[in-house]
Amino acid sequence: MAGKTVTRADLSEAVYQQVGLSRAESAALVETVLAEICTCLSSGETVKLSSFGSFVVRSKGKRIGRNPKTGVEVEIEPRQVMVFKPSNVLKARINGGHVNGLDMDEDE
């Protein structure tokens, strides 16, 4: 799947091929996992996936920004943002490195 954007359908197909569920069950599983992640994030919880990373909801306070075209100051309201922080294992795998003596390029 490298070199392209991976979609829900791609994830469902991977589950279908690797786990052996039906295509419908694979799609339902992917949707259930994504829905649970969304529900947790919506309620302000952190979602931590071991060896992958964490999805964290952060609060940004009110601040003064500037319109880049006009230079006029604008008040930016407080808001919630979602941030993904990759694990060291994922970072090493992306960079072709090793973690704790494991070759992250090999299939696990």
Curated annotation (Swiss-Prot):
Keywords, comma-separated and alphabetical: DNA recombination, DNA-binding, Transcription, Transcription regulation, Translation regulation
InterPro entries xref list: Hist_DNA-bd, Histone-like_DNA-bd_CS, IHF-like_DNA-bd_dom_sf, IHF_alpha
Highest rank taxon of the organism: Bacteria
GO MF terms, alphabetically ordered: DNA binding; structural constituent of chromatin
Record-annotated disulphide pairs: none
Transmembrane segments: none
One GO CC annotation: cytosol
Function: This protein is one of the two subunits of integration host factor, a specific DNA-binding protein that functions in genetic recombination as well as in transcriptional and translational control.
Assembly and binders: Heterodimer of an alpha and a beta chain.
UniProt cross-references to NCBIfam families, sorted A to Z: PRK00285.1 (NF001401)
Family: Belongs to the bacterial histone-like protein family.
Identification of the protein by name: Integration host factor subunit alpha
Name of the coding gene: ihfA
